[in-house]
């Protein structure tokens, strides 16, 4: 056993809180999928509309590549994908690609390991598909993958207050607000290529009560495992928002 005046839990999976007995939110029907980002070189970036992704409602992705992949799914095996989204870097001919996805409980070591292996296979498969079917990627080669699979959703604690999507989208101003969020509510489907993306009309507020649970006054939980429903979490889960929660938890401690 370990004792301390404050414990700050800012990891992706609230294992400490779980082992201490903090109640968790119900997982719901499905978790958002995990994705592995990869980097390609040899791309004809002059022919690729790098910063001009098609906008369909509020979803930004390369519509031409998406339609080509959807057509391919009808006659050959194409893994589940999202987007695709890509962005350039400072090196000409190099792009970062976000398109892989798989459903898994990434808080479970066995499922996480299986997902990691599967997504690395999909990276190679998608690289070959892009080479064969998208002219700008004809000479592309795989340069790197992310150090590990990106996880959008696992466990969340049940705190003194559970931030709801309704409160978040309407920017309810809480008296104990400690941080704000402005990223869209971004929910990726784990069973299709779909995505729900809803932009905020104004920056949302996140209350301190979402970082602590009844009966655990010296444990602060920051990051995407804070107390929120699936809709609010789908916005706050990104880097800038969770950094704000970490700063708030550190100041409170």
Specify the residue positions occupied by each region the protein language model found:
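Flavin (FAD/FMN)-binding glycine-rich loop and adjacent Rossmann-like elements that form
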Residues: 2-252
């Amino acid at each position: 056993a370990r004792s301390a005046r404050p414990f700050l839990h800012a990891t992706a999976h609230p294992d400490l809180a779980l082992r201490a007995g903090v109640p968790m939110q119900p997982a719901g029907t499905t978790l958002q999928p995990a994705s592995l980002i990869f980097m390609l070189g040899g791309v004809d970036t002059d022919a690729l509309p790098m910063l001009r992704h098609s906008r369909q409602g509020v979803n930004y992705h390369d519509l031409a590549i998406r339609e080509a992949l959807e057509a391919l799914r009808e006659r050959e095996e194409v893994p589940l994908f999202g987007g695709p989204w890509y962005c350039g870097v400072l090196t000409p001919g190099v792009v970062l690609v976000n398109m892989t996805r798989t459903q898994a409980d990434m808080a479970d070591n066995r499922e996480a390991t299986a997902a990691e292996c599967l997504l690395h296979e999909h990276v190679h498969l998608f690289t070959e598909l892009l080479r064969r079917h998208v002219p700008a990627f004809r000479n592309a080669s795989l340069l790197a993958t992310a150090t590990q699979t990106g996880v959008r959703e696992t466990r969340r604690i049940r705190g003194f207050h559970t931030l709801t999507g309704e409160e978040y989208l309407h920017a309810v101003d809480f008296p104990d607000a400690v941080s704000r969020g402005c990223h869209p509510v971004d929910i990726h489907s784990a069973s299709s290529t779909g995505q729900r993306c809803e932009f905020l009309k104004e920056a949302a507020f996140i209350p301190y009560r979402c970082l602590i649970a009844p009966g655990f006054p010296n444990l602060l939980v920051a990051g995407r495992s804070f107390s929120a429903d699936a809709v609010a979490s789908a916005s706050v889960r990104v880097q800038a928002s969770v950094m704000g929660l970490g700063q708030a938890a550190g100041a409170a401690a």
